[in-house]
Amino acid sequence: MTTLRRTPLAAVHESLGASFTDFAGWNMPVRYSSDLAEHHAVRKNAGIFDLSHMGEIRISGPDSGAALDYALAGKLSAVAEGRAKYSLLLTDEGGVVDDLVTYHLPDGDYLVVANAANAETDLAEFTKRCARFDVTVTDESAQTALVAVQGPTAVKIVLAALQKANTTLDSDEVRDVKYYRCLTGELDGFPVLVARTGYTGEDGYELYVPAKAAAHLWQLLMDAGGEDLTPCGLACRDTLRLEAGMPLYGHELGTDIHPSQAGLGRVVNFKKEGDFVGRCALENRDTTADRVLVGLTGEGRRAGRAGYAVVNEDKTVGAITSGILSPTLGHPIAMAFVDPDVAKIGTSLSVDVRGKALNTTVVELPFYKRS
């Protein structure tokens, strides 16, 4: 029997009475109280998440930008220091190995954040793809903890935490840092990366610290947030990201799925100079018959789930990739890959929910946008 990996905050989660689940070989908190309560807490106030199972890969050296331009679909060399970019790691055939956020750090290095399920694969791919360049690829996953604070009061809580700490970070700069930008500094003697990024559809921060500082950072944030900050597990993170129309690897993304199918054609930069992995395959691919990702909404309380068939006039035209009864909106929502001729906004389709037809309508993503 394989022993599950534990994050640096495992003891904290146990003390809070969390329920755990196996996620990509990690023993992760799935919930602390209830999925709904945690979901609503993030939409109304703020939630705190342990995301230390994610992978962190540092790319350093004079050719870092060029190496990432070759390894990834985006033009990372054009990303200014202190900014971040969402990009894709592709196969030679143009399928998606992983979707990633890459930070161009103020010191000139790049930090690539990989999904937990793909961290080892991603590391191997970056090591192989960067071998021709003058760079160093370093796996910092085991030494790094990641804590996210997300929700309407996230900014207030993080600023309050900074005021309680001995830090080189400027509170005004942290407050004003824009979406997909980051700052570095020290927090009570530990290095910290503060990024205005997230996976919930809400405002907030993701904070990276050494693993040994994880419990200290968590408690600092909890003390600052008080009743306005709720510990949140992976269950509500999934419902939050689905409402926000954000893809999840293994559901909306995979090596058999190409970027344009998932609505991510914009992420692939064909204008950048030189080759990149997957370029030739995508440039020569006929996409006219590819199924495409759409949003579906329905009425009532029954929700389609991953794998359920999408039907049009008694013909199966697709399948759901993720589906829930939306806690925020109060009706069923789903993302699905469907045939292109039924993907137009406003098209009526049905979902086979255990032998019963759920009437749905194709809608624009995301389902939820914060005001």
Swiss-Prot record:
Pfam families for the chain: GCV_T (PF01571), GCV_T_C (PF08669)
Q: Does the keyword Transferase apply?
A: yes
Q: Which GO terms describe its cellular component?
A: cytosol; glycine cleavage complex
Role noted for this protein: The glycine cleavage system catalyzes the degradation of glycine.
Entry similarity comment: Belongs to the GcvT family.
**Protein name, as recorded:** Aminomethyltransferase
Q: Where are the transmembrane segments?
A: none
Q: Which domain of life is it from?
A: Bacteria
Q: Name one GO biological process term.
A: glycine decarboxylation via glycine cleavage system
Quote the subunit structure annotation. The glycine cleavage system is composed of four proteins: P, T, L and H.
InterPro entries noted in UniProt: GCS_T (IPR006223), GCS_T_bac (IPR022903), GCST_C (IPR013977), GCV_T_N (IPR006222), GcvT/YgfZ/DmdA (IPR028896), GcvT/YgfZ_C (IPR029043), TrmE/GcvT_dom1 (IPR027266)
Q: Read off the PANTHER family from this record.
A: AMINOMETHYLTRANSFERASE (PTHR43757), AMINOMETHYLTRANSFERASE, MITOCHONDRIAL (PTHR43757:SF2)
Q: Where is the signal peptide?
A: none
Sample GO molecular function, one term = aminomethyltransferase activity
EC number(s): the record gives 2.1.2.10
**Keywords tagged on the record:** Aminotransferase, Transferase
Catalytic reactions on record: N(6)-[(R)-S(8)-aminomethyldihydrolipoyl]-L-lysyl-[protein] + (6S)-5,6,7,8-tetrahydrofolate = N(6)-[(R)-dihydrolipoyl]-L-lysyl-[protein] + (6R)-5,10-methylene-5,6,7,8-tetrahydrofolate + NH4(+)
